Amino acid sequence: MSKKNSIWVGILHMGLGTVLAQMINIVVQPILTRIFPTETLGIYTYLISLATMIIPVASLKLDMLIVSEPNEKEAQYITDACIIINILISLIYAIVIIVGYQVSDNNIFNKYGIIIYVVPVLVFTNGLRFLFISYLNRYKEYKTISIIAIIREAIRAVIQVGAGFLSLGVFSLSMGYAVSPLFGLNIQMRN
């Protein structure tokens, strides 16, 4: 396949995968607003916002180097370093949350109780997600990236909607966001 055609195939795979994944999200959001109380959705959004402040830098953006590193061995070292850094950042954030939760009764970490402890898990699993997207991007595995995005959103939707019908609350909403990237990792490991 020519380089020009492979670029278009990559664009098609990434574009279609992104659109389908977002369509799942667009369809599920109104369902979630009907089956979860407003307060539960608000707490969930709060937890996600605390996680998304850290997720983009969970590996200190070193995952970007994986794509461009010409040496395979060096790329593997970078990947390993990113995993370790992601673990460390998640643990540091967990410590900050634990200390913040214990120090005062009136701060952002103890506003909604112990549910705050799910945030470092969100950081860790989604940090891994971005790391392995970079790894797949290195090998131009755009179709796999798209399939993983679709499956991740579908699994998140099933977990969250199922939790809503079972009245499981904000923890289950958060777990949908935390667990769904792991299914993508499972697919990637098989490739």
Residue ranges of model-derived segments:
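C-terminal transmembrane helix end/exit motif
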Residues: 3, 63-66, 131-138, 142, ...
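Signature of the first transmembrane helix
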Residues: 5-60, 94-101, 122, 152-157, ...
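Membrane-interface helix-capping segments at transmembrane helix termini in multi-pass transporters
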Residues: 7, 34-45, 69-81, 91-124, ...
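Short alpha-helical transmembrane interface motifs in multi-pass membrane proteins
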Residues: 9-14, 47-51, 84-85, 113-118, ...
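Transmembrane alpha-helix boundary/hinge residues in polytopic small-molecule transporters
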Residues: 27, 61, 65, 127-132, ...
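Alpha-helical transmembrane segments of multi-pass membrane proteins
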Residues: 53-54, 95, 99, 108-136, ...
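Helix-loop junctions and terminal segments of transmembrane helices
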Residues: 55-74, 137-138
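Hydrophobic alpha-helical transmembrane segments
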Residues: 113, 117-120, 147-191
